[in-house]
Regions:
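Short, well-ordered alpha-helical segments
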Residues: 2-37
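Short, surface-exposed, polar/charged, turn-prone segments marking secondary-structure boundaries
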Residues: 36-38, 65-66
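A cross-kingdom feature marking charged/low-complexity
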Residues: 44-66
Length: 66
C-alpha cells in the first residue's frame, strides 16, 4: 500500500501559469522525491497598467512517502 502526502506551494512567473506551475514542481523536487501529481488549486495574476506582469499559481503537489 502506498502512502501519499500533499504539500501546498505558491509560485509565480512573468511568462504564464504553466511556467509558474513548472517552477513550483522544479523547486519542490529539490527536497521532495517521488512526485506523482500536481493539482492547480488557484490561478491569479497581477496587473501593471494595462499589462499582466505576474502569473501566480497555488498548487498542491502529491508525492509518495517511502
Amino acid at each position: 500500500m502506498a502512502v501519499l502526502k500533499v504539500i501546498e506551494i505558491l509560485a509565480n512567473s512573468d511568462k504564464s501559469w504553466e511556467d509558474a506551475t513548472r517552477k513550483a514542481v522544479k523547486h519542490a523536487s529539490k527536497t521532495v522525491k517521488n512526485i506523482k501529481s500536481v493539482y492547480v488549486n488557484e490561478q491569479s495574476c497581477t496587473v501593471n497598467g494595462d499589462d499582466v506582469n505576474q502569473f501566480r499559481v497555488n498548487v498542491k503537489i502529491t508525492f509518495e512517502v517511502s
